[in-house]
Structure formats: C-alpha cells, structure tokens
Amino acid sequence: MEFQIILVVIISALVGLVIGFFIRKNIAEGKITSAEAQAKRILEEAEKNAEGKKREAIVMAKEEVLKLRNEMEREIRDRRNELQRLERRLLQKEETLDRKMDSMEKKEESLSRKEADIENTKAELTNVLNRQLAELERVSGLSSEEARQILLNDVEKELQHDMAVMIKDFENRAKEEADKKARDIISSAIQRCAADHVAEATVAVIPLPNDEMKGRIIGREGRNIRAFETLTGIDLIIDDTPEAVILSGFDPIRREVARLALERLISDGRIHPARIEEMVEKAQKDVEVQIREAGEQATFETGVHGLHPELVKLLGRLKFRTSYGQNVLKHSIEVCHLAGLMAAELGIDVKLAKRAGLLHDIGKAVDHEVEGPHVAIGVNLCQKYKESPEVIHAIAAHHGDEEPRTIEAVLVQAADAISAARPGARRETLESYIKRLQKLEEIAGTFEGVEKSFAIQAGREIRIMVKPDKIDDLAAIRLVRDIAKKIENELDYPGQIKVIIIRETRYVEYAK
C-alpha cells in the first residue's frame, strides 16, 4: 500500500515536471518571440530616427556653410574697402610729397642763386678791404701785422690794468672780511674761555702754630735750617713776621717739596737733620704723585684722550713750571680751550686743535734737563711718543720757527698769543730773574763731579753738592774757583755771588 502511494507520488512528480517543462518552454518561447519583435521594432525606429537626424545634420551643415560664406564675403568686402581707402591716402601723400619736392627744388635753386650773389659780394668786399688796407698801410707807414700787434698790446695793457684793479679790490674786500671774521672768532673764543689765573709768585708762606717753632726750625747753631736748605735747594726765610716763615725759590717743584716737608715737620714736631731728610724724601714722592694726577686732571678737563702715559706725566710737570710768571699747565689748558673754540667756529677738526694746543709747550717740562729750545724738545718728545704729524707741526710752528701749513697750527699760534697777552698773565722781570737763576745752576752743572746745585738767596749764593768719590778737598778748592770764574765770564748779575761747595761723606753701620 505504501509502495503504491510512493509510486503515485513519484508518477505525479514526474508528470508535474513534464508539464512544468512544457509550460516553461512555452513561456520562454513567448518571451523570445516578444523580445525579437520588440528588437525589430526598436531597430526600425532607430533607422527612422537616424535618417531624420542625418537629414537635420545636413540641413544644419548647409546653413553653417552659408553663414560662413556670408561672413567671409562681408570681411573680404570690408578689407577691399579699407585697401581702397589706404590707396587713396597713399595717392594723396604722394601728391603732397611731389608738391613739396617741387617747392624744395625751387628753394634750392633760389639759395644757389643767393649763394652765388653772396660769393660775388664777398669777393668785392675782399677787394675793397685789401685796397683800404693797402691805403692805410701807405698812410700810416705800418704793416697790418705791426698795427695788429700794437692794437693787441694796447688791449693787453688795458686788460692788465683792469685786472689789477679788480684783484686789488677783491684782496681788500677779502682782507676786510677775513679780519672781521677773525675778530669775531677770537672775541667769541675769549668770551667763552674764562681764565682767572695770573702770574705766580716765587715764594710760599708757611703758617706756624707759635713763634717758638722758629727756633726749633733753625736748630742748634742753625743745623736744621742748613740741612733743610741743602736738601731742598730753597731759601727758608725766618724774619719778624709773626707765626710764619717764608720759602723762596724759583723752581716750583723744589718749592712744593720744601712746603710739604716743612708743613709735615711742623705738624710732627720732631725737627732734626735726619727727620728733615726723611720728610724731604716723602715730599718728593708725594710731588711725583701730584704731577701724575695733575696731568690726568688736565686731560680730563680738556677732553683730550689717548695720550701716551709719559706725555700725561710731562703735562703734570708743567704744573710746576712757569713762563714769565705764568703757570705753564694752566696756560696750556687755556690754549687748548681757545684753539678748540676757534676750530669749532671755523668748522675744522676740534679734537686735533685741542690736542695740539694742550701739547704745544710740552717741551718746557724737561727744558731744565735737556739742552735746546722748548719747541724742538716738544717736537722730539711727540715724535718719540707717536703723536700725529699735524700735532707735531703745530708744536713746531707755534713760535714761528716753522711756517704754519695747516689751519690748526695757525689756531694754536693765535691761542698761544691770546693766552700770553692776557692782562696779568705774565711778568717779564720775574722771567728774566728766573732765567738768571737757572743759568747760574746750569753753569755749575757743566763741571765734572757736580751732583746737584741750588741757587739761593735770590741768586746771590749758589750751593753745589759734589760727589765725594770724584772730588777731594784739593779738587774742591780748584772747582769752586773755576765755577766762580765761569760765572763772572758768562753771567750778568748785580753785586756778587757767593759760591759754596759742599762735600759730604757718610759712613753708615748698624749696631746689632
């Protein structure tokens, strides 16, 4: 029974499959037939559309060709018209050019005729001029060249006279303007440079706490005062002046050393030859410090920098030098300021002018030790310490020993004269007195064996320290006579001069 059911099911399935196959086949064949029909219809429609588009494209192409043809014809027509217009303009220009050429030819012919007429006229004038010249030569008895030379000479003389008058007029006006400008510059510089320094004295007054100190200064039998004067070379004057003693000497350095030493001795109270010698040595060292500080202060005050240290030290020594009673350092600072002010007015190098002004008298710092004028000494010093040629030239020319070649040299010369000529700055008699004392010491220093010499008592006495190992007692007698004889022959002086030779021998031993 189950087998039959299974068989029926299988047969039913097979029949279903066969029926389904045929049904599917019929459906597929129907779809194929429908698709073929649709494809055919689409092809037919496409052929119809393609034919229409082809005809439409042909029509559009024909229209485009026609349009392009019309544009080309219009452009060709426009260009033809433009060419015709240009041809007409060219023809007009050719006609105008032809007319101008004709006119030029006519003018050229006219100019040729006029040129020929001018040549003829020139030839006639030349003939007339030659005849007149010949007649003038016959009448005057001179050739044309001689007459021309006479005329040129007359003209030259007249021109030379006129030029001389003009040159003199210009020179006078230039001198007047230069003098006025120079006066204005110098007046301005003097007004702006206020200097209150006047001539220095050759004495220093030392106050005392009481008159009893005078006896201590003199010492037993005058040994203290003799030791002091011998060591310092300065006169110590003790008179009736209450509570004061006077130091007198022409050398400011010695006078300053003596002043410092005496003030310290008075303050210390212990006054005897050994103490005096100790204080004098300390005072000398202090003066050296003062010299250096004075040089540095001078460069700071004037604004002149970059100087060699030795030049700065020499500037400081000028503080203790005088020229006709005028302090040389203050004079140099004044010249520096004046030269700088005048240089500023003229618009030239102010620093160079001030540097030359400050160093112009540097030779006076060592003129006691070195022979020769202070100008030459200053030039040598500045060359040694590598100063510029302009500064060296200004120093060499400031007293007229050399012709000034630069404006700065002229300004230093003028500033030096202004400072020296200022009322109260110098005293001629004092300078001659100091020079006589210096000469007195120089004469003593020329002899061999002399260690140092001091002119004291206003030049009426000179004390000479000799080297004991070179000068014995007999040689000292001969030496003092020789020095006195040389002073008589070479020096003019009033009255008489006392020459003293001091020969001192020291033997030192320490007790241990």
From Swiss-Prot:
Annotated membrane topology: Single-pass membrane protein
Keywords attached to this entry: Cell membrane, Endonuclease, Hydrolase, Membrane, Nuclease, RNA-binding, Transmembrane, Transmembrane helix
PROSITE patterns reported for this sequence: HD, KH_TYPE_1
Similarity comment: Belongs to the RNase Y family.
Enzyme Commission number, as recorded: 3.1.-.-
Cysteine pairs bridged by disulfides in the record: none
GO biological process: mRNA catabolic process
CDD domains, per the entry: HDc, KH-I_RNaseY
Gene name of this polypeptide: rny
Gene Ontology terms, MF aspect: RNA binding; RNA endonuclease activity
Record's GO cellular component terms: plasma membrane
Protein name: Ribonuclease Y
Transmembrane segments: 3-23
Subcellular location per the Swiss-Prot or TrEMBL entry: Cell membrane
Highest taxon in the source lineage: Bacteria
Domain named KH: residues: 202-265
Function: Endoribonuclease that initiates mRNA decay.
Residue ranges occupied by any HD domain in the UniProt entry: 328-421
Pfam family membership, one: RNase_Y_N
